[in-house]
Amino acid sequence: MQKRRLILHFIYLTILFYSCTQSDKVNENTIFRYNEYRNVTSLDPAFARNPQNIWPINQLFNGLVQLDKNLTIQPEIAKAWTISPDGLTYQFSLRKDVFFHSSPLFGENQTRAVVASDFVYSFDRLKDPKVASPGGWVLQQVESYKANDQHTFTIQLKTPFPAFLGLLSMRYCAVVPHEVISYYGSSFRSNPIGTGPFYFKRWDENVKLVLRKNTRYFEKDVKGRKLPYLEAVSIQFIPDIQSEFMLFLQGKLDFINSLDASYKDELLTPTGALQSKYKERLNMLKGPYLNTEYIGFYLNASNPAIQSKKIREAINLGFDRNLMIAYLRNNIGYPANQGFIPKGLKGTSGTPFPYDVEKARNLVAKYIEEGGEKPILTLTTDANYLDLCEYLQRELQKIGIDIKVEVLPTASLRQAKSSGKLELFRASWIADYPDAENYLSLFYSKNFSPNGPNYTHFKNKEYDTLYEEALSTLTDSLRVKRYRQMDSLANSEHPIIPLYYDQVIRFAQKNVEGMEINPINLLVLKTISKK
């Protein structure tokens, strides 16, 4: 009976998918189709908090600057900019050929050009408590901003912040039209008007989202051809990952992102190569991802083992990261054996962590000799990482540490971690912007959770001094030197145990051309075409 239900469910999803794709009369070879198994909650850039929101928002909106596939800052609506010698004043010259998507709210012409005052409005809105954007923190370093004229926008910082352009590349900082938001209010989330390569067509929430080509889009490719190439983007919302995978194998989705445990062995060999039976049908793309998976200690926990540097160091030494990646991830990812900062960013201390079971056992033995009881720790995770935590549980038992694994829903885990209710937790840190400061901020004492990302409540005066010096340092080489010192100091105290640095991995149909990957796993569709 259960098998019959699953078959009927899949038939229903297939019929739904077919009927949805037929409803838009566009050549199939010009429609890019993907599934989002998590629901999009908003198409408003002020709420571009998670990948499922950011991906469609990135097709609909533009900001002052953008990142290329190598994380280099590139022009977007700003065609050029200058930075004052003291690092406090950023002046942007705006393009004159950027227009909002068509809307009757613009009046007779149905559109208008973007001007500098639109960025003043967009930034005001991002900070507005009534909007309650989770991205308001992006402008914390900003003292003021103004429109000098229609095509010049100036930002004044409180203190120098060398990573500021990276912050501005986030979709939180996209430009939005005041006329449309004044009309729709909070319903702008489902009635977005932007400037991006695609415009909003239709959204049947939890079913399908359709975007269409913006024929007035301002960007061109390196050969001078207008972007985008595609006529439409069709996003399905099928929550079952197995059903998504089946549709992909049937050619009804153009790509899938990431690698789920339920089908990793079907697609990949144990060494991480694409299985030979799929080489004629699929392309695999993979590369560094600015995402560090780790376990964190809440250092104010009552458990004395958590407060013991010996126990934290023993855990860091007591499991084989290489085996973990091979066994659980088919070698997708890199063992995190050199600190918290992932591959692709400057600033790691470069000092490797050995796998040393004997030293780990000795550290546990010394802890017990000095009056401690056998360490018993509770590690909290969500269901997606249960296999990882059970691996750690087995390995650490071998060095004399007992781990109890508890599973919480993702939202509950996030809340409990932020409020200091978990003595030991599994977490991820995905870069918001491409600078090592983004990672090192997790150990700055003024960033204690729940108001900041220092979930461990690590506090060290020397670290804080180095962090503040780095923020005010405009010389890249000196700033990176401070980053290395901070990374080394944090590694020596072990407030967190880095597990692995993730990789972006995507599988695409052979007829998909122009798909690139980048270390922040942003989906860029303006340069994609289908044969």
Q: Could you tell me what each predicted segment is?
A:
Residues 186-189, 217-270, 402:
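Ligand-site clamp/hinge motif
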Residues 506-531:
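Long beta-strand-rich cores associated with HINT superfamily self-processing modules
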Residues 313, 325-328, 404-413, 418, ...:
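Extracytoplasmic/peripheral linker and loop segments enriched in polar/acidic and small residues
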Residues 35-85, 124, 131, 193:
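N-terminal lobe/hinge region of extracytoplasmic solute-binding protein
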Residues 131-178, 199-204:
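Surface-exposed binding/hinge segments that line
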Residues 115-120, 154, 196-197, 227-232, ...:
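Alpha-helical secondary-structure segments
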Residues 198, 334-367, 385-387:
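Structural transition elements
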Residues 333-334, 365-431, 504:
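Ligand/substrate-recognition segments at binding pockets and active sites
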